[in-house]
From Swiss-Prot:
Residues reported in the UniProt entry to bind ATP: 221-228
Name recorded for this polypeptide: Replicative DNA helicase DnaB
Name of the gene encoding the protein in the UniProt record: dnaB
Disulfide bridge positions per record: none
Protein's organism: Buchnera aphidicola subsp. Acyrthosiphon pisum (strain APS)
Catalytic activity from the UniProt record: Couples ATP hydrolysis with the unwinding of duplex DNA at the replication fork by translocating in the 5'-3' direction. This creates two antiparallel DNA single strands (ssDNA). The leading ssDNA polymer is the template for DNA polymerase III holoenzyme which synthesizes a continuous strand; ATP + H2O = ADP + phosphate + H(+)
Every SF4 helicase domain range: 190-457
């Protein structure tokens, strides 16, 4: 038995990773015949995709020559390689001549490039699989959950590279086809003006047409204004109206507290009574009804891990998306609690990376991503304390990346004798594809809930 295992190990060590030297040769030879093919080829492959080291060196040298404005041919390429002492490493002049000679046409060069790329991806999968296996043998103190996150993020990085070639400029005909198809879909599907995810708030829907897929939505407010409550209400409404899951990342509050708020909101039961357990029969009946609905739908996921990194949020969101064949909404509370260890010494760059990743996630999964944000204390010094975009903490990247920015303002927080008690202003500070303005909602703090405002709204 031991001998058989040893034999298999030896066989595995002799395995040659998948590659196609013929396809690599055809790509390089084709580029020497027709330099104009470089742009299309470079959309498909990079130097590291070549299995043969001489081929990698040749491709790199071709790129350098083109960057300097020189043509690629047998003479220029061999001369450049010789000056750098690399000609011997690639097989000398005779091998370059063979590449050029054995490539009769460039007609299928992109197909050959695809073959090179496909083999490279499979090799990378093998490499990543080995790294994952090694991580399992040598955990370095990491728990199984951390190892799973590492494995998942490693595989998804390969997937990102795999689909990168689908990006880039599109002809107007293709974009028009996609646009007309979207318009026709909206025309044929009754939606009462809501083209995105229904917020559950009539006046807010009129302003935004719902929370649009692929958009990054920032909700910001000073403490005690109710930003977590508002964001949770949006998640609750989405969970009740749609079947696909809502994913909540709560970096600040434990999942149990989130659920208590949710039960109070959906059951219309005073959250103080829920927290203290002082419930009457009617309260229990309401809560039981809500629990039954939540268990029937089973479409809310809460991750209360602290200090998550953008890559962890992305990998976990992808996992839930994949397991459920889609998502309705993602919410992060709040983004300043996320961390990027490699950028920890520069908070501005750290927030920029977090913002960029969340925007990319929304676009990748085609779902709205809501991120809660803090506001600068400086607004407290103003007479009018209604927030504006510049009040966003580390505002530059957030304001730039966000498609929709909503601020919450409740006058009663600052003015004890305010005649606007129980009224919240949802201030739309930015909307990339719609108007800005203000919508009023009723704030029922004892239920941890914002509701539609029955009085007259204003713009």
């Amino acid at each position: 038995m031991a001998k058989d295992k040893l034999y298999l190990n030896q066989i595995n060590r002799l395995k040659i990773p998948p590659h196609s030297l013929e396809a690599e040769q055809s790509v390089l030879g084709g580029l020497m015949l027709d330099n104009e093919q470089w742009d299309s080829v470079s959309e498909h492959v990079v130097a590291d995709d070549f299995f043969s080291k001489p081929h990698r060196l040749i491709f790199q040298e071709m790129q350098k020559l083109l960057d300097l404005g020189y043509p690629i041919d047998l003479i220029t390429l061999s001369e450049s390689l010789e000056q750098k002492g690399k000609l011997e490493s690639v097989g000398r002049f005779s091998y370059l001549a063979e590449l050029s000679k054995n490539t009769p046409s460039t007609a299928n060069i992109t197909a050959y490039a695809d073959i090179v790329r496909e083999r490279a991806i499979v090799r990378e999968m093998i490499l990543v699989a080995n790294k994952i296996a090694n991580a399992g043998y040598d955990t370095q103190g990491r728990k199984s959950e951390e190892l799973l996150d590492y494995a998942e993020s490693s595989v998804f990085k390969i997937a990102e590279k795999r689909f990168k070639k689908d990006s880039g400029p599109k002809n107007v005909e293709q974009i028009l086809d996609e646009t007309v198809a979207s318009i026709e879909k909206l025309f044929l599907s009754p939606h009462d003006g809501v083209t995105g995810i229904n917020t559950g708030y009539q006046d807010l829907n009129k302003k935004t047409s719902g929370l649009q897929r692929s958009e990054l939505i920032i909700i910001a407010a000073r403490p005690s204004m109710g930003k977590t409550t508002f964001a949770m209400n949006l998640c609750e409404n989405a969970a009740m109206l749609y079947d696909k899951p809502v994913l909540i990342f709560s970096l600040e509050m434990p999942g149990e507290q989130i659920m208590m708020r949710m039960l109070a909101s959906l059951s219309r039961v005073n959250q103080a009574r829920i927290r203290t357990g002082q419930l009457n029969n009617e309260d229990w009946a309401r809560i039981s009804g809500t629990i039954n609905i939540l268990l029937k739908k089973k479409n809310i996921y809460i991750d209360d891990s602290s200090a998550l990194t953008p890559s962890e949020v992305r990998s976990r969101a992808r996992r839930i998306y994949r397991e459920n064949n889609g998502l309705t909404l993602i919410m992060v509370d709040y983004l300043q609690l996320m961390r990027v260890p490699s950028l920890s010494e520069n908070r501005t760059l750290e927030i920029a990376e977090i913002s960029r990743t969340l925007k990319a996630l929304a676009k990748e999964l085609q779902v709205p991503v809501i991120a809660l944000s803090q506001l600068n204390r400086s607004l407290e010094q103003r007479s009018d304390k209604r927030p504006v975009n510049s009040d966003l903490r580390e505002s530059g990247s957030l304001e730039q990346d966000a498609d929709l920015i909503m601020f919450i303002y409740r006058d009663e927080i600052y003015n004890e004798n305010s005649d606007l008690k129980g009224i919240a202003e949802i201030i739309i500070g930015k909307q990339r594809n719609g108007p800005i303005g203000t919508v009023r909602l009723t704030f029922n703090g004892h239920w941890s809930r914002f509701d539609n405002y029955s009085g007259q709204k204003y713009d």
